[in-house]
Curated annotation (Swiss-Prot):
Residues 4-94 form the 2Fe-2S ferredoxin-type domain. It comes from Palmaria palmata. [2Fe-2S] cluster binds at C40, C45, C48, C78. It comes from the Eukaryota. GO terms for cellular component: chloroplast. Keywords: 2Fe-2S, Chloroplast, Electron transport, Iron, Iron-sulfur, Metal-binding, Plastid, Transport. This is Ferredoxin. It is found in: Plastid, Chloroplast.
């Protein structure tokens, strides 16, 4: 699979991980020792929400975010594949509401 650099802007600092278009961002982060918030792991809640600040992701598996939230660049990291090098601000659940 094509490899991408995913930059995670977390409350604890900026972390760079390697991702690819077949692995969800949340899984890639965990595989590389970075704990991000999650609950359902199925794209059906908002615990893992982040904001895509740069780049693109495919989160067609998600069922929670509405069009307005998607247009505001919100992302559910548990069901998002990177489709380019990207930067995601994590821990954004409270900003959804």
């Amino acid at each position: 699979a094509v490899k991408y650099t995913v930059t995670l802007s977390t409350p604890g600092g900026v972390e760079e991980i390697e991702g690819d278009e077949t692995t969800y961002v949340l899984d890639s982060a965990e595989d590389q020792g970075i704990d991000l918030p999650y609950s359902c792991r199925a794209g059906a809640c908002s615990t893992c929400a982040g904001i895509v600040e740069l780049g693109t992701v495919d989160q067609s598996d998600q069922s929670f975010l509405d069009d307005d939230q998607l247009n505001d660049s919100f992302v559910l990291t548990c069901v998002a594949y990177p489709t380019s090098d990207c930067q995601i601000k994590t821990h954004q659940e409270e900003k959804l509401y």
